[in-house]
Amino acid sequence: MVKVFKCPECGSVVEVREENIITPLSTKRIKVLLCPYPQIGVRNHIYQHIVRIKYYGEWEDPKNFLISGKEGLHEVILGTRDEVAFYILRAELWRNGGPIVDGAYLSKHTRAKILWKDKRAIGYYSEFTHTKVPTMAEIYVRPQYRGNGYATEMIRDFLNSHKGPVAFYFIHRKCMRNLLLKVGAIEKGGEGYIFKRQIELLSWQQDPIIFWENDKYK
């Protein structure tokens, strides 16, 4: 008899069949059951809802992985429940209209930290470690927790983790400027910005008129 689960989003009955299962994590022992009916999220992002996660033999509600006894920022370890949580959060980022950076999944070239508060996953940030300088790839705060300074907390943790120059792979330039202003990495000065922390701009960030509005380096 085929096991079935109800999709919590569209209400469809989803059968546990090979065509509905993917293994996108570091071990094939962790399986993801997807609803076969695509949905359209924010900014027309097409996605499939995560119905269940099979974690080492047991099918679990995805929400279970976003609950933990941890507190604060913790690095994600491959093959653990935190890796599943990271996968779920990235899927949520896409569903909510956020950009997914190519190659920012967990690997030997990418590390990530999840922020936990009151036993709940608040969000995460990831960084590339194989680039010229440490580069923040993605940062995400879940909608229900925004406005509490959590993005600032994660930016500050990233900066404090590296003594030398860093870079930020931000699609939304205004968002990047605002966050760096909040943590004191840059400050407004005259017609542009003064760098208080050594930050390298990526190739597509180089145009000062588009990005920094006539930046001034200290």
Where are these predicted regions, by residue range?
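Conserved acetyl-CoA binding element of GNAT-fold acetyltransferases
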Residues: 132-143
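Terminal substrate-recognition subdomain of acyl/acetyltransferases
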Residues: 1-133, 160-218
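Conserved acetyl-CoA-binding loop-helix of GNAT-fold acetyltransferases
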Residues: 141, 146-160
